[in-house]
Amino acid sequence: MLSKEQILERNKLIRENGLKTRMKRAKQICKTFRFKIDYNNLNKQQREYIKMLFVEAKWIYNYLISQDNIYSFNYKDLNQVTHKDKNKNDIVSDIQYVRSSVKQELITQIVNQIKGLSKLKKKGHKVGKLKFKSEFNSIKLKQYNVTHSLRGNKFKIQGIKDLIRVRGIEQLKKYKNIDYTTANLLYDGINYYIALNCFIDKDNIEKQYKNDIVGIDMGVSTSLTLSDGTKYDISIGESDRLKKLQTKLVSKQKGSNNRYKLIRKIRKEHIHINNKKNDISNKIVHS
């Protein structure tokens, strides 16, 4: 138990460090880099841990929004939660994978969402209530070197025994003196990613300016035609494969394994189409 003097000294140190950080951040810009986890390189224990991390986060989130005392809820009480099984029956499960920092963050996230809805309601907007999630897609890692850290081309995540190999580290090579901060562990239904927030000195960022002036014509047969003759066809619709998969989905029974597998294939095809769109947009921006 800290004495009153020790508490005052600790708070003073926190204020001083906070002031130093704010002064430093004023000379920096924030960038987020996204890295894809090399799932094929993960061992059995790592795959199980990452999978259950999102499953338990979903259980906790759904359990919390069903509670009446969310504002005074203690994260230390989240050792067990009640959730639904696939037959909609209530079952109690132990929380084995989600750490205390993530539990705290989930409580904070829900409280902020409720406050946001309350503000909208006071302004006259029609609002509902928070809905239960069938899938959880983002887990915040809030303290670098504790919940997560970057080591070469691999990440260390709290709770996972071995390092996790990721793809895309070369994005960082053109920057110097990077301050790594919070991160988000992401899941799009198929692949896992780590989105790492960084602060970079403004002086270390090279600004490239092009003095060329280019005219743009938006046509029908070709989406974009530049005055230098460059043409871009950025119209990407549904693929034939996606149409076939969506047609098959109608005949699948809800809740069946075959329907679940088919939904994963449809989601994967959507991701593939979105990747094509992002690739074209990046080529246009950097051309």
Stretch-by-stretch model annotation:
Residues M1-S287:
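Nucleic-acid substrate recognition interfaces
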